[in-house]
Amino acid sequence: YKFAKKVEKSGLGACNALSRDICVADKTYQENVCKFLVDTTKEFDISYWKLDGFSYRPCTNSKHHHMVGGENDMYYYSEMWQGWIDIFKSVRQARAEEGKDLWINMTCYVHPSPWWLQYVNSIWLQNSSDIGFADNLEHQPQLEREITYRDGRYYHSLCTRAWQIPQRYLYNHEPIYGTEAKVHYTDEEFEKYLYFNACRGQALNELHLSYTMMNKTKWRILSKVVQWQKSNFDILRNAMLLGGNPEENNVYGYFSWNENGDGIIALRNPTDESAPLTLTLNRLMGCPENLKNVNRFNVYNEGAGENFDSYSYGDKIDLTLKPFEVKVLQFGKKDRRYDYLEAVDEFTISFKYSSNEENCAICENDDVKITVEDGCLKIKCDSAMLTSSGKITGGEHKITVVREKNKMVKLYMDHALDGSVYDAAAKGEIDTKMESDALEFSAVNKATSYEDIVALKRVLTKAVKRRKK
């Protein structure tokens, strides 16, 4: 209010007494704002403007340089918005003259109508706080409360009120991980949070992050998720919300498909109980009717191995979501999870260990070395080093070592992930030809977890038999 009065006193605009802020319809103010935006855009090569706070309440002062009156103050609003449309056009023209693009984000006090998309690029959700936390369940993690709150606002907008605007044009403030937000997430929670946010399909992500809260792992997670989101936006841009209201403890998700049969399905259970469900790949799920023989890949699917089945239109997928579980699954002829990376060779080494030897060699060549030292499993893969979390002597263990296309090296112990490391300096190609006396030793040029080794061997065996025929 003080700033608005100062603007008015200086002759640069007017003060709206009802909303106690600047009168954004005042012609003098609009002329000054337009000049400021155009000049600043040119001087500082600005490509993004976030215009926050239009008209909270109409200005009824007839002495200001705008119309007043009409039903629901329609004359004021009509003239105000016409003036701002001219401003949007002027700023865009300034960028266009230099052959450059401009993103305009309209935030507070805007009708979320697709009509605006001829002038702006995104519109704030309107029915939401910057950040919020749902109260659908007691004693749930803070992360779950935040995700449920945001998706509850999406449900209210897109389902209850049935807004007719594609989700890619909605701005939602995420991701938020800053000191003022009073949140704290583990690295695992941070990854889950970012992936599910990306699947809402919004084209604009403002990174509301406090660098003091970030560590190396979180920066790498952020980079990985943002690059995956960008390289798959031709799919995610078609996201739609399906399922029930998460604030009423219903399973829900976001479904995205493009015309080529590439798809992304993100599912979430917002409750503290397991939830079985069946997905049918049909038009209701956004699938193109010509969907045929696509593969399924895990983007975010904790503890689950890769799936070797193929899927076509009308197929059903039976799943069970654990309490608060998120699954992000990708479909397509091609594995597009790592399109943004200079992918490296992938492989899987698996074997059983049932010896009491505290020190022995499992396998070794110039690039890969697996040993048991002081009872613990030691893995050297190119420049990556990984050690098991505990001793493997004194019983039988199923061991799997995986290098993925994204340069992650993972150790699975008895069907569960035991440890992982990111090899930033990984070579593109490494030698996996080696021999070993270990039980059921196998090395294949494909990344998969232990429980899928048998299935993979079966697939490879069938392929060899077909070639022989």
Predicted regions, residues:
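Localized edge beta-strand/strand-to-loop motifs within extracellular or lumenal beta-rich domains
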Residues: 397-410
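Active-site groove signature of glycoside hydrolases
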Residues: 33-67
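Active-site-adjacent "subsite" loops/lids of carbohydrate-active enzymes
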Residues: 1-44, 137-141
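Flexible glycan-contacting loops in extracellular carbohydrate-active proteins
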Residues: 421-452
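Extracellular glycan-recognition modules
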Residues: 338-385, 392, 408, 443-464
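The substrate-binding groove and active-site-proximal loops of carbohydrate-active enzymes
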Residues: 15-34, 68-83, 181-183
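Active-site-proximal substrate-binding groove within the catalytic cores of carbohydrate-active enzymes
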Residues: 84-303, 316-331
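C-terminal beta-strand-rich structural cap/linker in extracellular carbohydrate-active enzymes
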Residues: 308-339, 465
